[in-house]
């Protein structure tokens, strides 16, 4: 159950070989490791990302805006391969000093506006284009309640449960039990909310749904961590209903494959520069 021989040192030191699946990119300091200018495409919105749950939040939002006919939401999505350290380039760190995807630059302003942290990007795009974040104070506040709930919950589901259950080089019973308990508690919170509402924040589909679905929707649908059975995901019937409903939205189907580098080749679009890329440049087409 536990390695009782381990005793923490008085002062921690970095063991570069001890980070498991992410040992080559995890480090205790910030800042760039190399100089590299980021590519820039033809649209004002330049997204630098990877198709993880956090990355999917933003590409789903952008595709939803485009589905409404918001032409100003056209964007270039550039792939940041975090396993190769792209997030530590000088160009990326200029946008996000925290070296985490996604990062967005809006070149329609002079000087350009940088936006980092996925929740901040969702709010920025909602405010900029006037969609998916209600103007009514009570509804806006409820949407933000759930957006920030997700921002606090995701590290427990991903960095906690997902890491120790799926990625960690050794299975630690205490850690898996600790974070499974929290993951299931969070699923129960969400299930009870969705028992009374079609969408997370009420009657409307909002940025709260776009933020929460890539994490909790993907988990209960078995798309990440291979943990749906372990978590007894089928017992959360309201989350299941909502997750399947959101998954069927055309913009979600598009957004979830942008900058994706795993899974079926027809669900990987490494870069996105216009709508035709979904038909012409998925990896199954590129490799044929």
Walk through the language-model features, giving the residues of each:
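Short, solvent-exposed turn/loop segments enriched in Gly/Ser/Thr/Pro and often Arg
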Residues: 81, 207, 259
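Phosphate-coordinating loops and pocket residues in cytosolic domains that bind phosphorylated ligands
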Residues: 94, 248, 257-258
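GST-like fold's C-terminal all-alpha helical module
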Residues: 2-3, 134, 138, 145-250
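Acidic/histidine-enriched, glycine/proline-rich intrinsically disordered or flexible terminal extensions
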Residues: 21-23, 260-288
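C-terminal anion-handling pockets and recognition modules
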Residues: 253-254
């Amino acid at each position: 159950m536990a390695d009782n021989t381990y005793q923490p040192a008085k002062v921690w030191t970095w063991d570069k070989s001890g980070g498991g699946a992410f040992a080559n990119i995890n480090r205790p300091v910030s800042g760039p490791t190399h100089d590299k200018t980021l590519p820039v495409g033809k649209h004002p919105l330049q997204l630098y990302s990877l198709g993880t749950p956090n990355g999917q939040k933003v590409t789903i939002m952008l595709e939803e805006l485009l589905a409404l006919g918001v032409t100003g939401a056209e964007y270039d999505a550039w792939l940041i391969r975090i396993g190769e350290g792209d997030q530590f380039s000088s160009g990326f760190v200029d946008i996000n000093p925290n070296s985490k995807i996604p990062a967005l630059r809006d070149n329609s302003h002079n000087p350009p506006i940088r936006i980092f942290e996925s929740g901040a990007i969702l709010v920025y795009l909602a405010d900029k284009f006037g969609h998916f974040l209600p103007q009514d104070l009570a509804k806006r506040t409820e949407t933000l309640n759930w957006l920030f709930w997700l921002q606090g919950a995701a590290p427990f589901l991903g960095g906690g449960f997902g890491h120790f259950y799926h990625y960690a080089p050794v299975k630690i019973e205490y850690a898996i039990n600790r974070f499974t308990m929290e993951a299931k508690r969070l699923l129960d919170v969400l299930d009870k909310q969705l028992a009374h509402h079609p969408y997370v924040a009420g009657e409307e589909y909002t940025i709260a749904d776009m933020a929460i679905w890539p994490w909790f929707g993907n988990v209960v649908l078995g798309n990440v961590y291979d943990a749906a059975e372990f978590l007894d995901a089928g017992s959360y019937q309201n989350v299941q209903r909502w997750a399947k409903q959101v998954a069927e939205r055309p913009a979600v189907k598009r957004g979830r494959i942008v900058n994706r580098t795993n899974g079926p080749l027809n669900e990987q679009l490494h870069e996105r520069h216009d709508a035709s890329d979904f038909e012409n440049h998925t990896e199954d087409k590129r490799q044929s």
